[in-house]
């Protein structure tokens, strides 16, 4: 793409050098620390005289496949709604997730599975790494179109560390239950990205306003991402829950919640839409809020009715957020939320955390029976009451918001370093800044500027 020679040279070197450095450093750390766990290592597995059918691979890998498809296909295509940013939406999703899953294997490994001087990995490590990558991609949605790939890799480098620490504090130190990640994934990823976007605020972004919308075919491709996410979300929430009734219940609650959020979204979209017409932005995003809102409580005894009610509420709140709150977020709070992650992940994530507080507080031995140990082991052991568990669930939400806000602020300062390449204000949401785009897709209105204006450089 045309531009100053120094800027083009910086772009040519910055991404390759950063990719090579990050991959090289990760490879060295893998060589030193990462080993197969006892369910993956040939010698250790067969030493135990186990049947191959008992290996956790056969129980967990189907869920991993679904989660993997959500991360790379669902999230990637959900963000292709921008008319001139499809290559970047899918391509940078691919890049970020590929790095994040490696880096998070190390970070989470040091925190959760570090024994005898090594990190031990298996299929559950893959699922956890994909969960972390999902949080990074949620944050990416808030700054979509306004950042370069080198900036995004540095964002992931920081966010993965903070994600791992926050998850460790909630799940291991506080004993919070969050099977589907309403707090650890959605709330953390959303508010990390929103604070990051606030720090990177661009007052002259109006110069790229004409590229910020969608066209017919870009919305259609984005709907592919929605359908992938919608279909596989029960697997996402249940991927790491206790096998048996717990996993079964988690998938069922998510299934009903998604269905109800879809109907709520269609209803509200037509109600608030111009001339009673549906808005594809609402359908693409708010219909998924049902999966987010039951992330914390889906393994609990939420009841099918509770799942339907939660999903419907999430769908309506998310739709209203896209219609009314997103413009306020930009005009009053100076948060330029490209994908509306506050509406799809932020608000439903907080609602999901609060729903978890309520359902945890109602937990009794009569309701759960012997299953109480797999959902609330500390209550089953008599180490805490249901009320104490509920209070710690609420405190976990506060801790998550704190980590996300501080981390997003630090990330914003890091990404504002002047030597990092980012698109100028006049060329945001434009693939040709970072990609070779086929010539037939150019027209006079979309052809890149020959000379970049100094006053629009980020």
From Swiss-Prot:
Species of the source: Macaca mulatta (Rhesus macaque)
Entry superkingdom: Eukaryota
PTM characteristics: N-glycosylated.
Record membrane topology: Multi-pass membrane protein
Keyword Transmembrane found: yes
Function of the protein: Ammonium transporter involved in the maintenance of acid-base homeostasis. Transports ammonium and its related derivative methylammonium across the basolateral plasma membrane of epithelial cells likely contributing to renal transepithelial ammonia transport and ammonia metabolism. May transport either NH4(+) or NH3 ammonia species predominantly mediating an electrogenic NH4(+) transport. May act as a CO2 channel providing for renal acid secretion.
Span of the annotated motif Basolateral sorting signal: 429-432
InterPro entries linked: Ammonium/urea_transptr, NH4_transpt_AmtB-like_dom, RhesusRHD
Gene responsible for this protein: RHBG
TM helices/strands, residue ranges: 14-34, 62-82, 87-107, 125-145, 150-170, 179-201, 220-240, 252-272, 283-303, 305-325, 347-367, 394-414
Gene Ontology CC annotation, any one: basolateral plasma membrane
Residue numbers spanned by region Disordered: 439-458
Extracellular face of the membrane: 35-61, 108-124, 171-178, 241-251, 304, 368-393
GO molecular function: ammonium channel activity; ankyrin binding; carbon dioxide transmembrane transporter activity
One BP term from GO: transepithelial ammonium transport
Principal location listed in the UniProt entry: membrane
Localization terms from the record: Cell membrane; Basolateral cell membrane
Recorded catalytic activity of this chain's protein: NH4(+)(in) = NH4(+)(out); methylamine(out) = methylamine(in); CO2(out) = CO2(in)
Family from the record: Belongs to the ammonium transporter (TC 2.A.49) family. Rh subfamily.
Lineage, uppermost ranks: Eukaryota, Metazoa, Chordata, Craniata, Vertebrata
Keyword Transmembrane helix part of the UniProt annotation: yes
Name of the featured protein: Ammonium transporter Rh type B
């Amino acid at each position: 793409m045309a531009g100053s020679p120094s800027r083009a040279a910086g772009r040519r070197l910055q991404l390759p050098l950063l990719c090579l450095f990050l991959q090289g450093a990760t490879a060295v750390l893998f060589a030193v620390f990462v080993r197969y766990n006892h369910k993956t290592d040939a010698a250790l597995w067969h030493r135990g005289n186990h049947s191959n059918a008992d290996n956790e691979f056969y129980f967990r890998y189907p869920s991993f496949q679904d989660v993997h498809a959500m991360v790379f296909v669902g999230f990637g295509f959900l963000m292709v709604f921008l008319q001139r940013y499809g290559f970047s939406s899918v391509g940078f999703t691919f890049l970020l997730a590929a790095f994040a899953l490696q880096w998070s294997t190390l970070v989470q490994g040091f925190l959760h599975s570090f024994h005898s001087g090594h990190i031990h990995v298996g299929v559950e490590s893959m699922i956890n790494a994909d969960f972390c990558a999902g949080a990074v991609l949620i944050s990416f949605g808030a700054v979509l179109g306004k950042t370069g790939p080198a900036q995004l890799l540095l964002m992931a480098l920081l966010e993965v560390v903070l994600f791992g620490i926050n998850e460790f504090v909630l799940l291991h130190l506080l004993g919070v239950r969050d099977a589907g990640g309403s707090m650890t994934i959605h709330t953390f990823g959303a508010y990390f990205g929103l604070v990051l976007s606030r720090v990177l605020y661009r007052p002259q972004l109006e110069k790229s306003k004409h590229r910020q919308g969608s066209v017919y075919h870009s919305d259609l491709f984005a709907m592919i991402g929605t359908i992938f996410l919608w279909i596989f979300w029960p697997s996402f929430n249940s991927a790491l829950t206790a096998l048996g009734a717990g996993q079964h219940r988690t998938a069922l609650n998510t299934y009903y919640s998604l269905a109800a959020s879809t109907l709520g979204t269609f209803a509200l979209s037509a109600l608030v839409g111009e001339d009673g017409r549906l808005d594809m932005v609402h359908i693409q995003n708010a219909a998924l809020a049902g999966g987010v809102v039951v992330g914390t409580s889906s393994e609990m005894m939420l009841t099918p009715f509770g799942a339907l009610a939660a999903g419907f509420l999430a769908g309506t709140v998310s739709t209203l957020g896209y219609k009314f709150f997103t413009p306020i977020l930009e005009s009053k709070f100076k948060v330029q939320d490209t994908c509306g992650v506050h509406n799809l992940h932020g608000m439903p994530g907080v609602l999901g955390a609060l729903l978890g507080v309520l359902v945890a507080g109602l937990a009794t031995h009569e309701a759960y029976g012997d299953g109480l140990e797999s959902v609330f082991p500390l209550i089953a052991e008599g180490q805490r009451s249901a009320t104490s568990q509920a209070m710690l669930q609420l405190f976990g939400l506060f801790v998550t918001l704190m980590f996300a806000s501080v981390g997003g602020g630090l990330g914003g300062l890091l990404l504002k370093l002047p030597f990092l390449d980012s698109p100028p204000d006049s060329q945001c949401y434009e693939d040709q800044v970072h990609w070779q785009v086929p010539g037939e897709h150019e027209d006079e209105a979309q052809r890149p500027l020959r000379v970049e204006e100094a006053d629009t450089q980020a």
